[in-house]
Amino acid sequence: MNYTKMMQYDINNWDGVNATIFFSGCKFHCPGCFNKEAWDFDYGYPFNKKAENLFISYGKNEHVDRMCLLGGEVFHQDLDAILDLVIRIKREVKKPIHAWTGYTFEELLEDDKKRVILTYIDTLVDGRFIFEKKDLRLKYRGSSNQRVIDVQASLQTGQIVIIDDLYL
């Protein structure tokens, strides 16, 4: 499993200051994707224990508000390693986790391992990027089919809880 970039002070992908990692590898290959180089699973650097520890240390910084997981595709990675990472974030960093995926929330719920990972994620931007639905006014996402989901509220209620008012 590889990552393309790790940022300690990211202000682009969510409000505030975020520790962000972009994982390598995506099978969706959405036309118009902003991060095509991350489609290649071999691109970037090995996500080993040293890289994981560095990312965790970024999150422990008092100026960092949350942890962001992007790609590539987070859920095309070694799911055991992703689960270990989100568990460590919740135990050691104790900050919200935001993730982006080309899967829909419903698709993730169909897979037991992906569903377990969701129990540690606070906010999910779901859905494949669709170039024809691209909207530069949207916050946190690129096309209007993508949703910003309150994962914990959705899991508790059994209904998808959308976070509204996300226009620039």
Question: PLM features: residue spans?
Answer:
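Receiver (REC) domain switch/active-site residues of two-component response regulators
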Residues: D122
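N-terminal [4Fe-4S]-dependent radical SAM core
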Residues: M1-F22, K27, N35-F41, I160-V161, ...
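Conserved Radical SAM active-site core
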Residues: N2-T4, N35-A99, Y103-D112, I117
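P-loop/Walker A phosphate-binding loop and immediately adjacent motor/lid segment at beta-alpha junctions
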Residues: Q77-V86, K134-L168
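Flexible, glycine-rich phosphate/dinucleotide-binding loops
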Residues: N12, E106, K133, T157
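Short cysteine-rich clusters marking metal-coordination/redox-active sites
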Residues: C30
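Conserved C-terminal portion of the radical SAM core fold
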Residues: K60-L69, R91-P96, V125-F131, L155-L168
